[in-house]
């Protein structure tokens, strides 16, 4: 069974968000998602300064099995991207909730957080797959 940290919020499309001290949110994909995809070989990230929209694709994770679109859980501006993934995409596999993060976004509407799932709700999504 996948690890689902209780302090994070989740999208049903398997992205997670973590609030940072500056009010921005770090985004990555869940341990469950990386297990389904398998070994990462390439990650395409948005650009710093890009505007992303909740529910729209903004990144791509390519594994030995498939390429998968990554959706932004929140609308806002990309403040940072995890440049370490360019040379080490396997960080998504080894540390999905830590060093394998994708990007940080400053949300334009924090009310969108209400559309995200808590750990229990996300577990229910996985169980229904």
Curated annotation (Swiss-Prot):
Residue limits of the Lipoyl-binding domain?
Answer: 24-106
The UniProt keywords, alphabetically, are: Lipoyl
User: Which GO biological process categories is it annotated with?
Assistant: glycine decarboxylation via glycine cleavage system
Q: Which InterPro entries match?
A: 2-oxoA_DH_lipoyl-BS, Biotin_lipoyl, GCV_H, GCV_H/Fam206, GCV_H_sub, Single_hybrid_motif
- Carrying N6-lipoyllysine, the residues are 65
**SUPFAM superfamilies named in the record:** Single hybrid motif
Per its UniProt record, what PROSITE patterns does this chain match? BIOTINYL_LIPOYL, LIPOYL
Primary role: The glycine cleavage system catalyzes the degradation of glycine. The H protein shuttles the methylamine group of glycine from the P protein to the T protein.
The text of the family note is: Belongs to the GcvH family.
What is this protein identified as? Glycine cleavage system H protein
């Amino acid at each position: 069974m996948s690890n689902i940290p209780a302090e994070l919020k989740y999208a049903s499309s398997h992205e997670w968000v973590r609030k940072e001290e500056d009010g921005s949110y770090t985004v990555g994909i869940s341990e469950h998602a990386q297990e389904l995809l398998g070994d990462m070989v390439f990650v395409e990230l948005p650009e710093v300064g890009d505007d992303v929209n909740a529910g729209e694709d903004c990144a791509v994770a390519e594994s030995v099995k498939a390429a998968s679109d990554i959706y932004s859980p929140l609308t806002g501006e990309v403040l940072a991207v995890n440049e370490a993934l360019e040379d080490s995409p396997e960080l998504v596999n080894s540390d999905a909730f830590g060093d394998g993060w994708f990007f940080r976004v400053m949300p334009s509407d924090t009310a969108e957080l209400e559309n995200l799932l808590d750990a229990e709700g996300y577990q229910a999504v996985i169980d229904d797959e």
